[in-house]
Amino acid sequence: LDFKSLCDIDTKDHVAVSAFVKKSMDEMLKKGLITDDMYRLTRPKLIEQFISSDVAARMAQADKRGDLYKEKPFVMDYEGVLVQGIIDVFWLENDKIVLLDYKTDRVNAAKELIDRYSTQLKLYADALGRIFSTDGKCIQADERLIYSFRLQQTIVTSREYKK
């Protein structure tokens, strides 16, 4: 999705959001970014709910500033183990990194996702801290979030992680 474009619509206007999602999906299909099957299986209402969220608004503002980064691969050594992954999305906000991971898991409670993914997000945060270090000082990814499409909510994991 083109998050910059979200700044141009009223994300509380359900008709405008629905039209934005439809247009975005049509463009992705036309460009070959998604297949016909993916297009048919996508549940636009879940995407619309996300677009109307506060976290999507924050992402739109970051994208407008040029501070939004999507699908960034990384490789790092973590305690003698080579770790690689792809970070869904992160952005810079108030000289800090905000890290967000999208999840579609079938869960009934946020705690399930926190238990399942907080370590993964901590590793991603550590990788970003190394990437964005300047003069020996790391910019920290203090805010680590999961957006659950199933629960339709943003979940904070950063306070839950215990090393």
What do these predicted regions represent?
Residues 1, 70, 89, 124, ...:
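A residue-level signal for conserved active-site and pocket-lining positions in enzyme catalytic cores
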Residues 76-131:
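Non-catalytic protein-protein interaction segments used by genome-maintenance enzymes to assemble
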Residues 13, 32, 80, 95, ...:
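Intrinsic-disorder/low-complexity loop/linker signature
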Residues 1-77:
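A non-catalytic, helix-rich entry segment at domain boundaries
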Residues 28, 128-131, 135:
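Solvent-exposed amphipathic alpha-helical surface segments
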Residues 71, 100-103, 147-149:
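Generic beta-strand/beta-sheet core signal
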Residues 66, 85, 95, 137-140:
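Residue-level signal for beta-strand positions within conserved beta-sheet cores that form or flank
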Residues 14-16, 20, 133-162:
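Substrate-binding beta-hairpin/strand module that engages nucleic acids
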